[in-house]
Amino acid sequence: SMVRELRRRKQRDEKPFAVMCRDAECAREICLVSEDEEKILDGFRRPIVLLRKKRQGLEHISENGFIGVMLPYTPLHYLLFGDDIDMLIMTSANLSDTPMMYRNDEAVEKLHGIADGFLLHNRDIQTRCDDSLCWVLGGAEYFSRRSRGYVPFPITVGEELPLLLACGAEQKASFCLSKGSYVFPSQHIGDLKNFETLENYTGQIKHFQRLFDIRPQAVVCDLHPDYMSTEYASAIAEEEDL
């Protein structure tokens, strides 16, 4: 009943929730966990790993055959697991279709109708970053969402590239910058269909440009003329005379 109420408040009728388990042994109580999956699950990046359900009766968490499982990745998470708590259902601190909130004042103001209480800290979060989501096949990670734990680490390519900004599409948006033989994919941004998400998208592009000292020589975008990412790319190209 608590999960149903959370779904009602979040307006999330069917989308699966993630589960944070105390450790890999706890994860094995509800899912099949291979050696390769445990290695990724227990690694320092701590993504959400899609694991096959071990038994029925967990449809309130996920209606399909898999559950997204992650292990604690901050000291605070470990403190939440008392003697009588082995697993926690997790969901992002956001309103439907808007970016995750990471400032205390904004969360308290906007999430009071969803959350019954708030666990806050005076150490402010500097950059919004969702959990990474992957599955494991043949010992390798395949991403549905490459974000916390992996960003802003670059990917090496086999040639020298010009300074590029690739703006991505509209749904499940992200962007990418290039410099030398490296490309720097951004974290997951979300669907670009409201001002809040667009503001986060443009702010993260500026943050990456400062972080890696990249001033693009060209901008790459989707051909769809009505995508917000395409409109942004066109505006930047005109502004910078690219």
Give the residues covered by each predicted segment.
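Active-site-adjacent structural elements in enzyme catalytic cores
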Residues: S1-D241
